[in-house]
Each structure stands twice: as C-alpha cells, then as structure tokens.
C-alpha cells in the first residue's frame, strides 16, 4: 500500500503533536517533584550544572551510578538555562521536559510509520487473514479507507495507556528509555520494509538507548528482531539488510566512550554499582525488595492497555496466529505464513516486540511496572491495526472482533461507574501522609467529572461502532484525552498539595532558620525532595532505633561533599525534620528539642547534639548497633 500524500502526513503529524502537547506539556512544571525517585534524578542533573561535572551524576554529595548519563544531560541542559530557578521554581519543568518530549516523539513515530506504510485490515481478519504467497493487496483506498485516522489512533492508543500517562510526565529515565528503544525498533522495521531507509538510524538510536539505561537495550532489540525473523522466515537476507556488524560498531561508538571514561575515573566503584548491581543483579536477583511472581507482567499487560485490553488480546492472537506456533514444534508452515511481504508485516512485528518484552522481563528476578513501558508502543500498534476491521464485510460478521469491541466499551463503562461510585470507596482510602485526601477528593468534584468523560467515551464508542473503522476507536479515545486536563492533572495537583507541599515548606523553613554550618537531617519518612528543595546535603535515617544511633555518629564522623563532621563542642545543634509518627516513639522522647516549624505531618526540630549522643549511647548499650558503615549497594 502506498504512503499517504505529504500534505496529509504533515496535517496528521501536526495534530498528533498538538494532542501530545495537551497530554504531556499542559501544566508541566505546575506541581512539585514526586518522592522518592524523581527528586534524585532532578537533584543529580542540577548538581551536574552546579559542580561542572558532566561525567558522573552526584546526589546529596555522593556519586550516583544507577543510570547512564543521557537523561541527566538533557535535564542538566535545561537547568543550565538562564534564570531557570526563577521561572521554574519547583524544578519539575526542567526535569520533566525530556520525559514529555520523548513520549511525544514516540507518538509521532508511530503515526508517521502508519502514514508511510498503511497496513490493510485483512491482515488481522479472522480465519487466517494472511495474503496468499507473494500477494500484496491492491487498491490502497479500498483496503484501508482511513489510514490517516488509524495513524492518529495508534498515537493516542500509546499516549492514553495508564502507564504512559504517569511516566510521560515524571523526571526519571523510563520515558526516555522507552522512546529510544521504541524509535530504534520502529527504525529497524522501516529498514526491513524499505531498503531505501537509512541503515544507520536504528543503530544510532540503539546507542542512545544504551546511554539511557544500559546494555539491556541491546538485549531487548536483539530479542525482538530474533523472534520476528524466526516467525517471518528468510532471516538471512533480512538480517543482511540491517547490517548488524557495522551497526553494532556504530552503537558502540555512540555509547562506549562514556562507559570507558566512567570506568577509568571511578574504577571499581562504578563497576560494582552500575554493572554489578544495577544491571546484572537486577536480572539475576531481587533488588530493593521488588519480588514479584513470575506472572507479574500479565496483569500489568492488561492494565496498561485499558480500556481496550480485549482489542489488544485479539490482535496479539491474530498477529502471531496459531499457525505460527507450528514452527516452535518443528512443523512446516504454510507458504503464506512465511511469505508475508516485509512492508505488510507491522502487526506481526509489533506482536514479536510485545512478546519479547514480556518474555525477557518475566525471566528477570526483579520486576517493576515500569519495565513494561517499552512494550506499550507495540500494544498501541496492535490496537490501532485491529480496530481497522469493519463492523460488517463481504466475508460476514467477525464475531470475535465485535465481542472484543463490546468488552472494551464495557470496561470503559465500568470505569465510569467506579468513578461515579467514588463516595462509596474513596472514604476507605487510608494514606497516612495525606489524611484529608478522601474528603478533599470528593469535595473537588473531579471524580464526577471523570465519570462523565468515561461514560461519554463508552457511549460514543457504541453509537459509532458501525461507522468507518478508525472513527469508532477515535470516538472512544477523544473523551479520554479530555479526561487528562479535566480530571487527572487536577487530581495530581491535589495530591502534590497534600503530600509534596509540606516537604517543600520544611525545606524552606530549614533554609531560613539554619545557623551557619548547622547540619540538616531527616528521620522516619524519607523524602529526597527535602534535599532538592533545600539545596543542602541531608542526612537520612529510618524509623528504627538504629536510625537515631546512626544519626548521632554520622554528625560526628561522616565526611561527604557538603557535609563536614564535627563534635558537639564545635556544632552543638542539628536541624531534624521528623514526622509525627516517628516523633512519638519512646527513644525520641525526652530530648527537649526546639520546634521551629511544622507543616502537615512534619516537624522541624533543633536538637541538642550532646543529648542526642547520650541517647544514642543508651540505645547502643541496649543492643542497637551502628549500621550506617555497613556496605550498601546504593545510598543517598
């Protein structure tokens, strides 16, 4: 099928960019950084600018080896803009913009791919649906009357994934990694579909993916391509088209210089933390208590595609198809199954993409919902392509497709009902950091607004079910686009006011009231945003008695940039941000602190260090040892 006219492509891409801006740029930076990981990324990027060290990120005075530097570089460039602290006082615009732009870039790439290589609906019809050997459907308009709308629907199917709506706005590396892996995967398929496409582009993007989150990017792309070429057949000529040997060299030229410099400068510390802990150990062992069952990503798959999960499952089955499994059993495939023209294989490629992510991270010991993000563009392609199927056709009624569509509408209606019944379940929410959340959420009317928009989506999807194929999916999606600025973002702002603002107020009070060189600590609930918004090194300790013992000893002995140890005779007091629950524990009683400020559940104390050390000695005598010097794979 021929590509759409250039003007049509441009109009669709402009519309896609506009919708992406509404979803991911609207009110970006209006809320603070969400604890705990985003402030660590933001503070690391800002420290690059302040320290002039663009090789290794640092946070709270210590090197941070968790990720390669690309996301930190992009954030740092924005923090380096003149006057950034004045026009971006919360710091969340500069730190979140790379995630937002990366997400919009994936939307544009999905749309552009479908605009240049429209896929006929017959590929995902029931009863096999594959062209005969060597066949290419003729009559682009007849085969797919609305490819422009299909392209737009694919972009929105990606952007409206619940996972993307969350990670597309927060300053971590996941959105950028998803973009680099996805853009590389799409560029590989485009090269397979058209030899005129540049062979260097996917390998360059793969190098950037390695600079975003490490060598796992190479493993993922290799798995995707291997699975696709295995099912597609004729792997050797297609693999030669990708030029893997010079391509991998190009990827290495992009990524390896930083790795070499980091290893040369920081040596064993970098190797043990980045390679050993954050890459190998995450795959082979559980880290940070992220132990999940082997089937963890199956419900993540279902939730990430809501409300069109039934469409995704139908498309996945048909794109791979029962015939494909014959190859795994060593049985021959019908010729048509392997002879699918490369430019018509996008659905099969998307299915292999999704399955590769599913299988790889299912095998990993550490499992997190964010690991599913690189699969969401593939899911979006499958949803958009299966939605091209007609409600009625000359071949009869596709009952499976109709059932999948009706189930998708039922899920949208069910979510609308859940929002409408908010007064029944919201009061059951118990969040110690936001005790007034249920009452304020119900009083805001946001749940009612959300219920109306989800109900409208289900209604429009039903009323337009028999209209030209892409319209029905867009009818479902557009009210959900409005749901983001109308209900989701205001809810986010409410949570920030209740949960994030008190920490920012504590940071402001500590900055205003601290004596010269007076150290700052936080015990109990640990919030890295206190470090970011105070601009000071913060000593963090937990709620256990060992936390008090560690704090007293660290004030005397721990030396890190921005934190100079001293005995109580030199620095007699310390500022401590403590939450209400921790402050009520017996071992924090009787220290006679001076309360300087309070906000939410937090208190700012000025603590006499001699009393603190006496209490620490009592706790040590009772069997609570120092633990802060014990080896840890990561700390801040």
Predicted regions and their residues:
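Membrane-integral, polyisoprenol-dependent glycosyltransferases
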Residues: 1-126, 130-399, 598-601, 605, ...
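Membrane-embedded architecture of ER/inner-membrane glycosylation machinery
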Residues: 2-3, 200, 318-636
């Amino acid at each position: 099928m021929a590509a759409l006219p250039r003007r049509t492509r441009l109009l669709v891409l402009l519309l896609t960019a506009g919708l992406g801006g509404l979803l991911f740029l609207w009110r970006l930076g209006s809320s603070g950084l969400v604890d705990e990981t985003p402030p660590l990324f933001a503070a690391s990027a800002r420290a690059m600018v302040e320290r002039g060290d663009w090789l290794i990120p640092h946070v709270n005075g210590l090197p941070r080896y968790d990720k390669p530097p690309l996301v930190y570089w992009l954030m740092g460039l924005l923090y380096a803009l003149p006057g950034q602290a004045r026009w971006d006082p919360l710091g969340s615009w500069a730190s979140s913009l790379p995630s937002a732009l990366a997400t919009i870039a994936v939307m544009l790439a999905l749309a552009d791919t479908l605009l240049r290589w429209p896929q006929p609906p017959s590929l995902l019809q029931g009863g096999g649906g594959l062209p005969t050997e060597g066949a290419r459907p003729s009559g682009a308009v007849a085969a797919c009357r609305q490819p422009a709308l299909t392209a737009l629907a694919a972009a929105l199917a990606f952007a409206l994934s619940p996972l993307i709506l969350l990670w597309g706005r927060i300053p971590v590396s996941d959105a950028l990694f998803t973009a680099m892996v996805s853009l590389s995967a799409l560029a590989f398929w485009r090269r397979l579909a058209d030899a005129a496409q540049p062979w260097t582009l996917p390998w360059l993007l793969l190098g950037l993916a390695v600079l975003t989150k490490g060598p796992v990017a190479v493993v993922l792309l290799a798995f995707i391509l291997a699975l696709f070429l295995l099912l597609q057949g004729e792997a050797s000529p297609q693999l030669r088209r990708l030029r893997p040997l010079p391509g991998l060299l190009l990827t290495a030229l992009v990524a390896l210089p930083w790795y070499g410099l980091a290893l040369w400068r920081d040596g064993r510390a970098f190797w043990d933390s980045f390679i050993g802990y954050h890459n190998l150990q995450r795959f082979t062992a559980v880290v940070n208590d992220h132990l999940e069952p082997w089937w963890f990503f199956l419900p993540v798959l279902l939730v990430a595609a809501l409300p069109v999960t039934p469409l995704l499952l139908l498309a996945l089955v048909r794109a791979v198809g029962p015939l494909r499994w014959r190859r795994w059993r060593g049985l021959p495939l019908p010729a048509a199954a392997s002879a699918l023209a490369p430019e018509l294989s996008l659905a099969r490629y998307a299915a292999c993409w999704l399955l590769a992510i599913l299988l790889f991270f299912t095998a990993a010991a550490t499992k997190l919902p964010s690991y599913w993000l690189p699969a969401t563009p593939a899911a979006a392609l499958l949803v958009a392509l299966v939605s091209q199927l007609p409600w009625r056709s000359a071949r009869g009624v596709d009952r499976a497709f109709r059932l999948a569509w009706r189930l998708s509408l039922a899920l949208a209606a069910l979510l609308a009902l859940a929002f409408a019944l908010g007064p029944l379940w919201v009061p059951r929410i118990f969040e110690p950091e936001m005790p007034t959340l249920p009452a304020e959420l119900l009083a805001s009317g946001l749940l009612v607004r959300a219920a109306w928009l989800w109900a409208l989506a289900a209604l429009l999807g039903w009323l337009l079910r028999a209209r030209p194929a892409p319209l029905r999916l867009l009818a479902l999606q557009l009210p959900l686009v409005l749901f983001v600025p109308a209900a989701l973002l205001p809810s986010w702002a409410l949570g920030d006011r209740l949960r994030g603002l008190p920490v920012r107020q504590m940071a402001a009070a500590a900055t205003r009231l601290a004596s010269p060189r007076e150290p700052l600590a936080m015990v109990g609930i640990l919030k890295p945003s206190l470090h970011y918004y105070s601009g000071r090194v913060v000593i963090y300790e937990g709620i256990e008695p060992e936390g008090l013992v560690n704090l007293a000893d660290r004030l005397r002995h721990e030396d890190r940039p921005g934190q100079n140890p001293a005995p109580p005779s030199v620095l007699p007091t310390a500022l401590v941000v403590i939450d209400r629950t921790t402050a009520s524990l017996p071992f924090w009683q009787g220290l006679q602190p001076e309360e300087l400020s309070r906000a939410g559940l937090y208190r700012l104390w000025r603590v006499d260090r001699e009393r603190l050390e006496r209490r620490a000695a009592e706790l040590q005598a009772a069997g609570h040892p120092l633990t802060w010097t014990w080896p840890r794979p990561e700390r801040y």
